[in-house]
Amino acid sequence: MNKKLFTQIKNEWRSNLWLITELLLVSVVLWYIVDYMYVQTSIYNEPRGFDISHCYLVQMGRLTDKSADFIPNQTDEEKRQDVKELLSRLQHRPDIEAAGLGQNSYPYNGSNSSASVVYDTLRSPGWTIRRLVSPDFVRVFRYRGTRGETPEQLAEMLKHPKNFLASDNLYKRRYGCDLTSLVDKQFYLFGDTTNTYNLAASLQVVRYGDYFEAWNSYCMVAPMPEEWYDLGTELCVRVKEDQDRDFIARLKADSEKLYRVGNVFIADVRSFTDIRRNFQQSHTNAWNSYLFGMGFLLLNIFLGLLGTFWFRTQQRRGEIALMKSLGGTDHSIFVRQLAEGLILLAVATIPAIFIDWNLANSELNAWMNGTTIE
C-alpha cells in the first residue's frame, strides 16, 4: 500500500504541488500567528513587581480665597506641613494598611521622570524611571527585594536619605550584571558626581504596565525630600483586605471633618483598578482587535483547508468506489486518504520551518526579552 500511495502522489504531482504550496503558506501564517499570541500572552503574565489590589489614589486639593475657610498668607513650610499632616492622619486611619507619597511613581502612570544610576563604568539606560517616594510607598504597592526583603524592610531602608533601591535588571541588558551583586555599594545618582548613595536593596523588576516587558522595565526608587511634599505629589493608600467595600464613600464622608488640614482637602478618590483599566484601554482594545482578526483569519484558513480536501475527495469519488469494489473498507480508505494528507503536510513543513527560521532570524516576528528567537 505504501508503495502504491507514493506512486500515486508522484503521478498526481501537479495537483499535489498546488496543495503543498497552500499548506506551506498556511503553515507559515499559522506559525506567525501562534508566535505573536504566545509572546503577547507571556508578556502579560510576567510578574509585575507590584500589587494594586486594595489600593487607591487620593487626589488633594487646596481651598481658594473664595472659600470662607481659606487661610491666607500661608508659608511654603506651612503648606508642606499640611500635606504631611494629611498623610499622617490617613496612615492612622483604622481601615488603611499603608499610605505613602510619590512623584510620578504610582503604577499605570503616564507621567514619568528619569534618572541616571552610575556605578564605576556602569551606567543605567536613559529610560530608567525615577520614583521619588515617602518610605511607606513601597508598602502600599508591596515592592519586594531580590534577596527576600519584605515591603516593610524596604520601607525602613528608605527612611535613610542616602539609601535608594533599583531594579535588579538595571545593568543586565548592557553589561550582563545583576544589581543584586552590587547591594551596599556606593552609586552616583541624578548626574551628581559629588554625592554618593547607597544601594540598600535590589528590587524585583517593577514593570511599567501589563503590556510592557519586564526585561525592558527599569526604575530606581529614592526617598523624596519633605521639601517636595505638596499638592503635586501622589497620595496612595492600601486598605486592609476586608475594608474595600464602600471605602471611597466612607473616606469622602469623613474627609471634611477629619481630613481637612489647613487649606488642603481630599478632592477625589480613585481605585487603582479603574486607573489600570483607563491607562491600558488602548492596549486592551488593540489586543482585542488582534484576537478578533486572528480568530477570523484562523477560521478562514480552517474552512479553506476543509474545502480544499472536501473538493479533492469529491473529485476522487470514482477512485474511492473502485477501491471499495476491490475489497477496500471505509476504514482502510480513510487511513489512505489521511496518510496522503499527512505526507503532503510533512513535505510542506520542511520549507515552512526554513522560512519561519529566517523570518525569526531577520527579526520580522514578535520580540520578547530582546530577541525574536528564544
Where are these regions (language model features)?
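Transmembrane alpha-helical interface segments in multi-pass membrane proteins
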Residues: 297, 318-364
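Hydrophobic secondary-structure segments that place a key small or acidic residue at a functional site
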Residues: 123-217
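Generic structural signal for small/hydrophobic residues in well-ordered secondary structure
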Residues: 40, 58, 90, 96-99, ...
